[in-house]
Regions:
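Long, low-complexity, Lys/Arg-enriched
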Residues: 1-109, 116-125
Length: 125
């Protein structure tokens, strides 16, 4: 059976909802992606920088509690300016060139709700 793999950015604004139980009452797009009954994400590859490690870990734990079948993978990147088109494009290009895609075994999705507008545009390019 083919697996579904999604790529996206950890949303430092939209995915952040604090550390207490109140985080479950806020819409967090990356978490919600993994709560869709009609779409099972087998692996979620989340790009983030070193400053967002803690948020990534919280998100990973929360996803495990609502979608235990989803493997959440940390892809740590270095972006000095997430609003710099050239830098973001180069980062995503390098990521894509270095990724071992297996199109005969996996289907790929891009989650564009999180990340800067520049990142959202660069995913398309």
């Amino acid at each position: 059976m083919r697996k579904t793999v999604a790529f996206g950015f950890v949303g430092t604004v939209l995915d952040y909802a604090g550390r207490g139980s109140q985080r479950w009452s806020k819409w967090r797009p990356t978490l919600c992606l993994c709560q869709q009954e009609s779409l099972v994400i087998d692996r979620l590859e989340l790009l983030h920088d070193a400053r967002s490690r803690s948020l990534f870990e919280t998100l990973k734990r929360d996803i495990a509690s609502v979608s235990p079948e989803t493997e959440v993978v940390s892809v740590e990147i270095e972006l000095h300016n997430p609003w710099d088109f050239e830098e973001v494009y180069a980062c995503l290009h390098d990521f894509a060139r270095g990724y071992e895609f297996q199109p005969e075994k996996e289907d790929y999705l891009i989650h564009i709700t999180t990340g800067t507008h520049v990142a959202q545009i660069c995913w398309f390019l």
